[in-house]
């Protein structure tokens, strides 16, 4: 199934942050549906921005989570939501989850590739994980550009290789990925990427959905 055209408002993460700064007036109040202020503390980040349980062949776990970060995020997991989902999965499964980030450029130019710069790498990681641990349950996740990576990777996989997937701020939120039965997407109200909204901070809020996403993936895996 061909992927839809890229929404015109899909901006790189650093551009979203720059725009967010310009939305703050002299009183220090950000124009956001959630009334985010620059003096309010950001949510505490949990987990690491890099995780390589598959590529390091760290041992078989009941669940394997492969995640693609958003544009310009650091490491291979990013910081907005990937590490938080990973930590939640470990907690919910009693540390029986392997976590792997997709090492792809995640640069602004990659948005035009509609996930093509990371999709093949994510699909390859799925194959590697199943070769190392045939009984593990594979689940996928992606944020922003990384969400497109999930769609691209799914089209290269066979039915049954991946039991579930979640995406956040997904430009293709209306399209269920190929070959994945259990799929859930998170799109915050006002998100300029998945809803063509005007609330830039909404696109950075998906850490709030990490626990719900992890619970969905654990259920999809039958654990």
From Swiss-Prot:
Function: Catalyzes the hydrolysis of complex carboxylic polyesters found in the cell wall of plants. Degrades cutin, a macromolecule that forms the structure of the plant cuticle. Also degrades suberin, a specialized macromolecule found in the cell wall of various plant tissues.
Family: Belongs to the cutinase family.
Keywords: Disulfide bond, Hydrolase, Secreted, Serine esterase, Signal
Organism: Emericella nidulans (strain FGSC A4 / ATCC 38163 / CBS 112.46 / NRRL 194 / M139) (Aspergillus nidulans)
Localization terms from the record: Secreted
Location (main, coarse): secreted
PTM characteristics: The 2 disulfide bonds play a critical role in holding the catalytic residues in juxta-position; reduction of the disulfide bridges results in the complete inactivation of the enzyme.
Lineage: Eukaryota, Fungi, Dikarya, Ascomycota, Pezizomycotina
UniProt superkingdom: Eukaryota
Induction: Induced by oxidative stress, in a manner dependent on transcription factor napA.
Catalyzed reactions: cutin + H2O = cutin monomers
One CC-aspect GO term: extracellular region
Name of protein: Cutinase 4
Active site: 144 (nucleophile), 191, 203 (proton donor/acceptor)
Signal peptide: 1-26
PROSITE patterns for the chain: CUTINASE_1
Entry's EC annotation: 3.1.1.74
GO biological process terms held by the UniProt record: lipid catabolic process
Gene that specifies this protein: cut4
Record site feature (Transition state stabilizer), residues: 71, 145
InterPro entries: AB_hydrolase_fold, Cutinase/axe, CUTINASE_1, Cutinase_monf
Disulfide bridge positions per record: 60-133, 187-194
Entry GO MF terms: carboxylesterase activity; cutinase activity; lipase activity
């Amino acid at each position: 199934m061909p992927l839809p055209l890229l929404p015109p408002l899909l901006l790189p993460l650093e551009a979203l942050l720059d725009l967010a700064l310009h939305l703050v007036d002299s009183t220090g109040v950000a124009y956001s549906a959630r009334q985010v202020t620059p003096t309010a503390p950001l949510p505490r980040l949990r987990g690491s921005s890099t995780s390589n349980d598959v590529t390091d062949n760290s041992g078989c776990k009941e669940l394997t989570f492969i995640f693609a970060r958003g544009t310009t995020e650091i490491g291979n997991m990013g910081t907005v939501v990937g590490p938080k989902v990973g930590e939640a999965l470990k907690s919910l499964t009693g540390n029986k989850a392997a976590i792997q980030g997709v090492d792809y450029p995640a640069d602004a130019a990659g948005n035009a590739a509609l996930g093509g710069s990371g999709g093949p790498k994510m699909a390859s990681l799925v194959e590697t994980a199943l070769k190392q641990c045939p009984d593990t349950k594979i689940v996928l996740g992606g944020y922003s550009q990384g969400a497109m990576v999930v769609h691209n990777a799914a089209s290269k996989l066979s039915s049954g290789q991946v039991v579930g997937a979640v995406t956040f701020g997904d430009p293709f939120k209306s399209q269920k990925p190929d070959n994945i039965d259990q799929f859930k997407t998170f799109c915050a109200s006002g998100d300029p990427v998945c809803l063509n909204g005007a609330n830039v901070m909404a696109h950075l809020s998906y850490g709030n959905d990490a626990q719900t996403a992890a619970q969905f993936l654990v259920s999809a895996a039958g654990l």
